[in-house]
Amino acid sequence: MIAVSFKCRCQILRRLTKDESPYTKSASQTKPPDGALAVRRQSIPEEFKGSTVVELMKKEGTTLGLTVSGGIDKDGKPRVSNLRQGGIAARSDQLDVGDYIKAVNGINLAKFRHDEIISLLKNVGERVVLEVEYELPPVSVQGSSVIFRTVEVTLHKEGNTFGFVIRGGAHDDRNKSRPVVITCVRPGGPADREGTIKPGDRLLSVDGIRLLGTTHAEAMSILKQCGQEAALLIEYDVSVMDSVATASGPLLVEVAKTPGASLGVALTTSMCCNKQVIVIDKIKSASIADRCGALHVGDHILSIDGTSMEYCTLAEATQFLANTTDQVKLEILPHHQTRLALKGPDHVKIQRSDRQLTWDSWASNHSSLHTNHHYNTYHPDHCRVPALTFPKAPPPNSPPALVSSSFSPTSMSAYSLSSLNMGTLPRSLYSTSPRGTMMRRRLKKKDFKSSLSLASSTVGLAGQVVHTETTEVVLTADPVTGFGIQLQGSVFATETLSSPPLISYIEADSPAERCGVLQIGDRVMAINGIPTEDSTFEEASQLLRDSSITSKVTLEIEFDVAESVIPSSGTFHVKLPKKHNVELGITISSPSSRKPGDPLVISDIKKGSVAHRTGTLELGDKLLAIDNIRLDNCSMEDAVQILQQCEDLVKLKIRKDEDNSDEQESSGAIIYTVELKRYGGPLGITISGTEEPFDPIIISSLTKGGLAERTGAIHIGDRILAINSSSLKGKPLSEAIHLLQMAGETVTLKIKKQTDAQSASSPKKFPISSHLSDLGDVEEDSSPAQKPGKLSDMYPSTVPSVDSAVDSWDGSAIDTSYGTQGTSFQASGYNFNTYDWRSPKQRGSLSPVTKPRSQTYPDVGLSYEDWDRSTASGFAGAADSAETEQEENFWSQALEDLETCGQSGILRELEEKADRRVSLRNMTLLATIMSGSTMSLNHEAPTPRSQLGRQASFQERSSSRPHYSQTTRSNTLPSDVGRKSVTLRKMKQEIKEIMSPTPVELHKVTLYKDSDMEDFGFSVADGLLEKGVYVKNIRPAGPGDLGGLKPYDRLLQVNHVRTRDFDCCLVVPLIAESGNKLDLVISRNPLASQKSIDQQSLPGDWSEQNSAFFQQPSHGGNLETREPTNTL
């Protein structure tokens, strides 16, 4: 049994009779009240003696409310034996029972008799100055049985005090130096009513002004000069109960408290073994439950004062706890006993304290214990890469998550000061900025917005080599705890700061702690965009207080990242402290191509998190083990369960990724940087890649005579590592495209050149014909329709051309093409294809196996085909290739012109003058991102997809330029072929489905509601095999039909809201709220429509019905739909 007693009893003072002297020690007052310091009959030893001066003001005819005993005739020095409740002396919060009065208004009392002392105090006047000696408080030592924790308490002054007495402080004699200790809490005062502060607690700071190194008089002055409301940082003791940590069954905990006082425990319910259990949900910081050290979050409450909780509701259990008397007996099952080993037995029986419990697979239900905290959650990614993330607090209705263990204040990070808990820091050691002078900091002001500080490495605390980085954090205030941070500045609040204020305190379970980025010692560079440097600490604190009105603040933080040890290659271990409710900051992914024995990959590291500050982890590093449990053959679920078992420290075994390793230099790889100035024109490069986070981004072709080719430093097959200093590590192709779009006039590319042996097999060395002859199959038909559209509507920062006098330009700003399969080679751990990268003019592209539609819209004189020329892929005979060679040259040149021009003047003119029909038909901007597969067909059986290729090019289409349009175009098989031709077509179609890329068009469409039908003329449905919302039916001649929508179009955005992961229940309200105008971004698979038409119709003209309604899904199955449908 563990009994912890915290008693705070109030002595009831009887009323003094009129003939009783207010300063005389009466018979009833010979015994000091309980809880007071023992009154010594002898002098205090010199080494434990402290002194202070107390000034009291009283009115004429009133008394101080002070009882004095002792005198030269009363066996002892004059001392305070009692303070009357509500008296002047008690309310001053400067005197305590047991203090020795050395002098009164400068008159030494050493030789005064008791009656003379009483007479002096009665007749001293209105101002009374007492010289007081007191016994110094004992020194608190943190050891195996006691640990220190901190808590921030906000108090309101009553008069000019907060209701507690402080002693200690710095002293000339080091042996007498003490922390500023609270020795007494006045009953009924502000501190007592708030309930957190207890005698023996240490006062560390007041409104951010730290008291370390201040004398007792200075500490008293700071308390008097602060405002009516002050934030006090308190350090308190927490008992370490070894018996709890080593217990093997239920425990009986007895806690003594004052009747009516709160234990500081919040309860909740959880389901365990299909039974409801009562567990501890929260423990208030510095409460009785927190200080005793026997109770922890997650403990099961089995009984309260002998009443079993087995069949009690949460409300009943809470009431039982509130009705407890001065002795609370709790039967608990410590939370650490509920953790099962990864391969542990299904049933574990624990018996103690006459109670038997049976547990099975408790981990699956443990998640419901803390629904408002951070957990390790399993989260499949949209691109089929399962990811293990450490997100923010899940909503109450979130799926079951996993509990994370609390962070022990004794656990310390070996990497950075910022990861230390305040309670673990010696009180003589506080963090400071690594750059000591104001001048050096001013030179860095312009760098505050950069993600990485340009300052060189410096020496931080404990001799560590660190570098500083900055990040921006947005906090939303909690109604109870606020933001949960306290700043620390100079000694004087009005002094101009020479360095930014520090975060000196972070409240447990506050927004500041839950964000996982802020740590004690971080420098606050700006608050809501206002720099803190060269302002006063009071101004910085006021900014923070003002933000609490709006419940939101944006902080710019500078923090240290360790550089003492940075592994360059090989395998190493990293230990991360795991705080309760705080994310580690790493995302672990399992690539879709992962095989048994392959490790998991670190795919993201949150900036400013514990993992980031170690300085040793990088994107792409392989995670081999967690707490010595290997992950080679572990699924993501296993990894989640292993992390669940982790205690205060998480030990990760890491293998450095090849691209992060220095060993690549010895393999012949060359890394360099190329800067390109586009001057309004295109770069002339084509990039290829996939949506897998760690697949390489490759330069697949260069425009002949283009900017990139003229540099001579960029070649086909080179890998792009970074764009404008933004690393592409762990980023898919879409992000690389976005970075290039936003790059501006100057584009800096970090290039990795392959080895000489590898570059010998460059795509340029192998003509296309030789590869096609190896395949021994039909040739591909060349078609300019393969050219994808420009993403100018998605990335509006496309640089327009400034050289309108030039007749034509080579290539586009970012022009990517797709090639055929060929011999692959290995470089840096990635498979590349030697034939994947060719110029658009060299490659064979695929055209629709259909007859043309030449239905012309009379109002603009454009054919249907010209307005919506698809990027569909298909196979055609070899004869068609010769027929369209000249045509391809024309279209290639025309589309290149459009690509180079950016948003041309003609387009801008149309945008200004376009009516509704022009907007619907002519102003649609196409953005095509093509996805395909790469396979090796070297006379072997077909293998499954080994790499998901994704390529992109940017093109802006406008059919308003007449010399680019073409009214008729035929790239179809002969319509009069016999059964053999039909069989051959089916065979080619099957080959196409296996080998050809899967094009996906992105369209931006603006629809206007039909005034007669009051709808947009289309219905939507949820995807069957793939998450998403798709167009199901389209009303002929309705807005959707006129706008170019087709069945199986997937809605990616509705009125600029991303709907990729939405279902119909979320999308339909968005469309309903759009009013008369609807902006859509949709993706389309042309092969779906191609296959549908091919199966429905014999060769011949298309019917309007066939062009509007498709009955079959694509071969990938991703466009199948299911009920319910909703007509909009």
From Swiss-Prot:
An example Gene Ontology molecular-function term = beta-catenin binding
Q: Name the membrane topology term.
A: Peripheral membrane protein
Chain ranges of the PDZ domain: 53-136, 150-238, 252-336, 472-561, 573-658, 673-755, 1004-1086
One Pfam family, short name: PDZ_6
The UniProt entry, under PROSITE patterns, shows: PDZ (PS50106)
> Which subcellular locations apply to this protein?
Cytoplasmic vesicle; Perikaryon; Cell projection, Dendrite; Cytoplasm
Q: Which residues carry this modification: Phosphoserine?
A: 43
Kindly report the protein's main subcellular placement as a broad class.
Answer: cytoplasm
Give the keywords, sorted: Cell membrane, Cell projection, Cytoplasm, Cytoplasmic vesicle, Endoplasmic reticulum, Membrane, Phosphoprotein, Postsynaptic cell membrane, Repeat, Synapse
Give yes or no: UniProt keyword Metal-binding.
no
Q: Name one GO cellular component term.
A: neuron projection
Signal sequence region: none
Q: What SMART domains does the annotation carry? A: PDZ (SM00228)
Classify the source by domain of life: Eukaryota
Instruction: Please list where the region (Disordered) is annotated.
Output: 754-798, 935-981, 1093-1128
Give start-end positions of Polar residues composition bias.
Answer: 944-974, 1093-1115
Disease / disorder: Fraser syndrome 3: A form of Fraser syndrome, an autosomal recessive disorder characterized by cryptophthalmos, cutaneous syndactyly, and urogenital abnormalities including renal agenesis or hypoplasia. Additional features include abnormalities of the larynx, ear malformations, and facial abnormalities.
Assembly, in brief, is: Interacts with EPHA7, EPHB2, KIF5A, KIF5B, KIF5C, GRIA2, GRIA3, GRIPAP1/GRASP1, PPFIA1, PPFIA4, FRAS1, PLCD4, PTPRF and liprins-alpha. Can form homomultimers or heteromultimers with GRIP2. Forms a ternary complex with GRIA2 and CSPG4. Interacts with ATAD1 in an ATP-dependent manner. ATAD1-catalyzed ATP hydrolysis disrupts binding to ATAD1 and to GRIA2 and leads to AMPAR complex disassembly. Interacts with EFNB1, EFNB3 and the C-terminal tail of PRLHR. Interacts with SLC30A9. Interacts with BUD23.
Any domain commentary? PDZ 6 mediates interaction with the PDZ recognition motif of EFNB1 and EPHB2 and with the C-terminus of PPFIA1 and PPFIA4. PDZ 4 and PDZ 5 mediate interaction with the C-terminus of GRIA2 and GRIA3. PDZ 4, PDZ 5 and PDZ 6 mediate homomultimers. PDZ 7 mediates interaction with PDZ domain of GRASP1. PDZ 7 domain binds CSPG4. PDZ 6 mediates interaction with the C-terminus of liprins-alpha. PDZ 1, PDZ 2 and PDZ 3 mediate interaction with the PDZ-binding motif of FRAS1. PDZ 4 and PDZ 5 mediate interaction with PRLHR.
Q: What is this protein called?
A: Glutamate receptor-interacting protein 1
Q: Organism, per UniProt?
A: Homo sapiens
